[in-house]
Amino acid sequence: MKLKVEKMSISFEQRQILQDVDFQVQKGEFVAIIGPSGCGKSTLLNILAGLLESENGKVFVDDAEVHGISSHFAYMPQNDLLLPWKTIIDNVCLYGKIHHCVSDAKKKALKEFETFGLKGYENAYPNELSGGMRQRAAFLRTALCDADILLLDEPFGALDVITRNDM
């Protein structure tokens, strides 16, 4: 087993958002969490990413309990959070910069720019890209983190149908 969530619960301002959520995700599985706006999808991802603390419940990766932020997870929030003063290649390679392996990160990123529909935009700035291209850059940045588990919040929200199907 790769990921296990047990009895996850959280409420905000006396409103129960998640209550006793249990699930498992096996290695190699892709899981989509669907539901109406406000039902707790983003909240669950924020808890898994270590950005929010649940009231109770546990998270396990390979049977080891995980608390807070963990290198097991790479999180892509709904907003792309691209740094406006950095080029797309520099934004995509932030993980490499943090971990002092920028040249390796750039090599990996450049190989994926075409796959993500970003070829030719390596030196562009975020404000020069469409919303869909910004979203793809954020997705690529997350994919390059070398995490075991990708947590993607609305990864295809700003993409047109053709690009969504290609991804």
Positions of predicted regions on the chain:
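The feature captures the beta-strand-to-loop junction immediately N-terminal to the Walker
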Residues: I34-P36
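Helix-to-loop junction immediately C-terminal to a conserved catalytic motif
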Residues: A49
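Conserved ABC ATPase "signature" region
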Residues: S103-Y121
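A short, proline-enriched helix->beta-strand linker immediately N-terminal to the Walker B motif
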Residues: L144-D148
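Catalytic Walker B motif of ABC-type/P-loop ATPase nucleotide-binding domains
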Residues: L150-D153
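Conserved ABC transporter NBD signature motif
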Residues: G57-I69
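Conserved ABC ATPase signature
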Residues: Y125-L129, M133
